[in-house]
Amino acid sequence: MELTTRTLSAQKHIALVAHDHCKDMLMKWVARHQALLAQHVLYATGTTGNLVSRATGLEVNAMLSGPMGGDQQVGALISEGKIDVLIFFWDPLNAVPHDPDVKALLRLATVWNIPVATNVSTADFIIQSPHFNQPLDILIPDYPRYLAERLK
C-alpha cells in the first residue's frame, strides 16, 4: 500500500478509553496531566468521558459507552483522521462482551499509524514526548490511491 503524510497539529485530538477495571487508573492519570490535557481536544467513550469531565472539569466530547458502540465511534474518528492519539487503558485479564470492537479499535489505530498508549507507562511516554505539543508528520495509507487501484 502506498503511503502519504498527515500532519498532526500542535493541538492534538486525544481519545480516552478505559475498561471498567481501568477507569480509576485513567482518572488518576488524567488528573496528574490535567493542565497539559486542557490544551488539547479530548474525546472519550461515554462513561469514561463523563467521569473525566465530572472529576476534572475538562471539556470532553463523549461518544456512546464502549459496549453500546462508543469504541466503534472512536474508531470511525480515527479512520477519518480526526483523532491523533489514543489513550486506551484496557484490561487484559478480563474479557468484555465487546472484545471484537476493542480489537477493531486497536487495529484502526495501527492502520492509521497514530500513537497508542495501553497503560500508564506508555501514556506517560506519549505525553512527555517532545512531539506531544508540536506538529508532527506521520505516514498513513494513501486511501485515494488505494481506492483508485481497487476500482481499476
Curated annotation (Swiss-Prot):
Highest taxon of the lineage: Bacteria
Catalytic reaction(s) noted: dihydroxyacetone phosphate = methylglyoxal + phosphate
Transmembrane segments: none
GO cellular component: cytosol
GO biological process: one example: methylglyoxal biosynthetic process
Active site positions: 71
Pfam families: MGS (PF02142)
Binding residues for substrate: 19, 23, 45-48, 65-66, 98
Gene3D superfamilies: Methylglyoxal synthase-like domain (3.40.50.1380)
EC annotation from Swiss-Prot or TrEMBL: 4.2.3.3
GO molecular function annotations of the record: methylglyoxal synthase activity
Domain MGS-like: 1-152
Keywords: Lyase
InterPro entries reported for this sequence: Methylgl_synth (IPR004363), Methylglyoxal_synth_AS (IPR018148), MGS-like_dom (IPR011607), MGS-like_dom_sf (IPR036914)
Leader peptide range in chain numbering: none
Function per UniProt: Catalyzes the formation of methylglyoxal from dihydroxyacetone phosphate.
Classification via HAMAP family: Methylglyoxal_synth
Protein known as: Methylglyoxal synthase
Species of the source: Klebsiella pneumoniae (strain 342)
UniProt gene name: mgsA
